[in-house]
Amino acid sequence: MKLCGVRGSGVSLMRSSNFPCFRAAHNGGAPTATRHQSLCGRCLDSHMGAGKRWCFRPLLAEPRRYGSASSASTTDAATAPVHGEDLYVSHYAIPEDARRLVGTPQLLPRNPAEEVAFKKNLIRSFPQACIRNVSVVAHVDHGKTTLSDAMLRFSNLLPADGATGTFTDRLKVEKERGITIKAQTCSVLLTVRETGTQYLVNLIDTPGHVDFQYEVSRSLCASEGAALLVDVRQGVEAQTMAQFYAALEQNLTILPVLTKMDNVMSDAEVEKTLLQLEDSTGLLSREVILTSAKSKQGIEQLFQQIIDKVPPPRGREGFSDMKQLPAMHPDSADRKKVEKELVPLRALLFDCWTSESSGMTDGAASAPVSTVSSVSSGTTAASGGQSVAKDGIYGLIRVMDGTVTPGTTVTFFHSGKKHEVREVGIIHPTLHPTAALTAGMVGFVFFPGLLKKDVFIGDTLCTLPTRKHTMRVVATGPPETASRTKPATAAETASSDDASGSSGSSVVEPIPGFKTVQPVVFAGFYPDEGVYITQLREAVDLLCVNDPSVTVEQLQCPALGPGLQLGFLGFLHMQVFKERLLMEFGQTVLVTPPQVQYMYVEQHGDPDDPAQRKPVSVSNWRWPHEGVGAYLEPFITATVLTPSEYLNEINSAALSAFRGEMQEMRVIDGARTLVRYRMPLADLARGFFSTVKSSSHGYATLEYDDPTYMTADLVKMDIVINKAHISALSTICLRHEATTHARRIIGSLKENLLRSSVDLPLQALVGSKIIARETVKAYRKDVTAKIHAGDISRKQKKWNDQKKGKERMARRSVGTVTLDQSVLAAALGATTAR
């Protein structure tokens, strides 16, 4: 075995002068990447001595490790991790690229006169047989975005010689947090060298966190295949299985992919992960694709598997509007023939954005100058002078049947409203206008002047080419009420048309939408001092176009004024939304403590029946005497992965302060421990996440699954200041914790409220019962300062007059106390303390 001996610190290569066996072969000097010789253990032992370790890596001239020979270098060896005498020859080497595929990006011509012809040729070259739609799904931090970036570089959309980054993470908050929040689409053009066949591969990079599972479900609806990524060292994790089952529900072709093969230390790690994947999903080990995004290996094989195994779309092809054809005489035979061949447009709207919340502003920053048009304010300007306008809404669609072009008037199925399409195109890798989007393609459409209230994610965009075409009447409301199934095939669509054709008309069916998602975390958002609620409402509405899973309701608080109650899919979702409000719209907001979604059932109801459960909150609270049979509290399974030295502190806090129950604990790799707790979602909101981060100095990670509901003894606690209810401080808690919780809030208010000319009573109520009370004493003037001697009755008279005056002032100032945001923020912080 030829070996490269490298110091564990990664400082430099060993010099041969220290080793007789090496010196005899090389006559001194430092070895290079191509001049390594065998080193005997005797020389190493005599030079290093006991207790010192070296890193050994087999040369790529021998049977390969996890990579190709082209990736070998002295720098790679010098930075290798230390693993002592773990010498091995990999049986899971990544195959070298066959160089059968080449990226052929099609650039907009600089000459405006050539642009129209270019757009037409771009579409003509892509029949459905040459289109592939694939979503990239995985657990958190398993390498989805990095692999997507490497795929874009392989296809020449990004510089091939650049370092692999995170191009598809376009939002500022994504770049700062280092996670994917929004699913991003990019169309890749590949050509087979042998045959010259060109393929259009639409890649959708999806988030991995459970809070953004709604993004994943929408992306899967627009795909025929899913690349299921698994980190070779982490193995199969919770979201891996969640994404697998989501893809299975959609009847998608699943391609298993192992990522980060450059981090592997032994074959045992690969074999363990392959066994996990096969046992948990049934995907065969021999079908797994090995990749390394950082070294850009295995990318061509992944693309080849996408082309070979993912089925092409099967929609009905054809024009969908007479405006898409040259002008014809109304009574001509050619026109009648063409009208019979028109195919109604059916397109699934699975994402929307505005120029303010697009995340496309920095899209061209890292792309080659020759391949990306100028990007400004979320819009892409074509080289020919045309630009995608800003004042409107962009929609990301998957065309099922027909064709959509600029100027096509489409009907939104569930609202029945018609809007004209101004621009269409693909994302390549930024907004890239084309002449049309045909059946099977994924691309964007732009609607000028479209209002947010007219847009429903999951709606069907359609056209009625002739009078014989009609739309099926559906119930009004958001389209997310139906569960998504596999897109109808051309045969199924044709059979539907045949069934209705006997009556002389053709019924256009809507595309099934997405499953309804219920928010699990609620928080009140109030504008910063000096900011009007209208500005906050406009910013929230624009952001909700891009994030439709957020629910919005109006709030009115006597202390804070008007606000909004927003519902989110999780705590990370709430934090990200708040950060996007600040980064994209400059809105600083005061956020009340997050409240989880509690449920109740009527008297004589079954708590185990989800159909009988109804949501309850502080705004619509009902007591048992009002017909409530039982309250239900959400519980989650929290998974903590922490360095072992921090385990005791985290475990103690989880069991004692956050009502956690340990379900599982296992050592991962000798240095890290995985622990699973069953705990209330409310306790997670009140500070368990912060405790995990602070106890582990930021090294531990925490994830949780979807909540399940269990019965609990809940009460609503109200805070009253000077006889005025402060709705922002009302909360739902367990009955036995209400007193402790109340004293903490009342104590914080007493410390931070400014004194006034009258006493301010502070009360915490459960129903009509006072469970905690404090008083902020009023300022008192020393009315006896000028009385130096004499009868005490003179002083008592002054004191009594002062007391009566205070009582008169108190009667006039009932409920008129004004809270500064700093005071309320301190009280809100007390609600999350343990």
UniProtKB/Swiss-Prot annotation:
<dbReference type="InterPro" id="IPR009000">
    <property type="entry name" value="Transl_B-barrel_sf"/>
</dbReference>
<comment type="function">
    <text>Promotes mitochondrial protein synthesis. May act as a fidelity factor of the translation reaction, by catalyzing a one-codon backward translocation of tRNAs on improperly translocated ribosomes. Binds to mitochondrial ribosomes in a GTP-dependent manner.</text>
</comment>
<dbReference type="GO" id="GO:0097177">
    <property type="term" value="F:mitochondrial ribosome binding"/>
</dbReference>
<dbReference type="InterPro" id="IPR000640">
    <property type="entry name" value="EFG_V-like"/>
</dbReference>
<dbReference type="InterPro" id="IPR038363">
    <property type="entry name" value="LepA_C_sf"/>
</dbReference>
<feature type="binding site">
    <location>
        <begin position="205"/>
        <end position="209"/>
    </location>
    <ligand>
        <name>GTP</name>
    </ligand>
</feature>
<keyword id="KW-0999">Mitochondrion inner membrane</keyword>
<keyword id="KW-0472">Membrane</keyword>
<dbReference type="InterPro" id="IPR005225">
    <property type="entry name" value="Small_GTP-bd"/>
</dbReference>
<dbReference type="GO" id="GO:0005525">
    <property type="term" value="F:GTP binding"/>
</dbReference>
<dbReference type="InterPro" id="IPR013842">
    <property type="entry name" value="LepA_CTD"/>
</dbReference>
<dbReference type="GO" id="GO:0006412">
    <property type="term" value="P:translation"/>
</dbReference>
<keyword id="KW-0378">Hydrolase</keyword>
<feature type="binding site">
    <location>
        <begin position="259"/>
        <end position="262"/>
    </location>
    <ligand>
        <name>GTP</name>
    </ligand>
</feature>
<keyword id="KW-0547">Nucleotide-binding</keyword>
<dbReference type="GO" id="GO:0005743">
    <property type="term" value="C:mitochondrial inner membrane"/>
</dbReference>
<dbReference type="InterPro" id="IPR035654">
    <property type="entry name" value="LepA_IV"/>
</dbReference>
<dbReference type="InterPro" id="IPR000795">
    <property type="entry name" value="T_Tr_GTP-bd_dom"/>
</dbReference>
<dbReference type="Pfam" id="PF00009">
    <property type="entry name" value="GTP_EFTU"/>
</dbReference>
<dbReference type="Pfam" id="PF06421">
    <property type="entry name" value="LepA_C"/>
</dbReference>
<dbReference type="GO" id="GO:0003924">
    <property type="term" value="F:GTPase activity"/>
</dbReference>
<feature type="compositionally biased region" description="Low complexity">
    <location>
        <begin position="488"/>
        <end position="507"/>
    </location>
</feature>
<feature type="binding site">
    <location>
        <begin position="138"/>
        <end position="145"/>
    </location>
    <ligand>
        <name>GTP</name>
    </ligand>
</feature>
<dbReference type="InterPro" id="IPR006297">
    <property type="entry name" value="EF-4"/>
</dbReference>
<keyword id="KW-0496">Mitochondrion</keyword>
<comment type="similarity">
    <text>Belongs to the TRAFAC class translation factor GTPase superfamily. Classic translation factor GTPase family. LepA subfamily.</text>
</comment>
<feature type="region of interest" description="Disordered">
    <location>
        <begin position="475"/>
        <end position="507"/>
    </location>
</feature>
<keyword id="KW-0342">GTP-binding</keyword>
<dbReference type="InterPro" id="IPR035647">
    <property type="entry name" value="EFG_III/V"/>
</dbReference>
<dbReference type="GO" id="GO:0005759">
    <property type="term" value="C:mitochondrial matrix"/>
</dbReference>
<dbReference type="Pfam" id="PF00679">
    <property type="entry name" value="EFG_C"/>
</dbReference>
<dbReference type="GO" id="GO:0005739">
    <property type="term" value="C:mitochondrion"/>
</dbReference>
<dbReference type="InterPro" id="IPR027417">
    <property type="entry name" value="P-loop_NTPase"/>
</dbReference>
<keyword id="KW-0648">Protein biosynthesis</keyword>
<keyword id="KW-0809">Transit peptide</keyword>
<feature type="transit peptide" description="Mitochondrion">
    <location>
        <begin position="1"/>
        <end position="66"/>
    </location>
</feature>
<feature type="domain" description="tr-type G">
    <location>
        <begin position="129"/>
        <end position="314"/>
    </location>
</feature>
<protein>
    <recommendedName>
        <fullName>Translation factor GUF1 homolog, mitochondrial</fullName>
        <ecNumber>3.6.5.-</ecNumber>
    </recommendedName>
</protein>
<dbReference type="GO" id="GO:0045727">
    <property type="term" value="P:positive regulation of translation"/>
</dbReference>
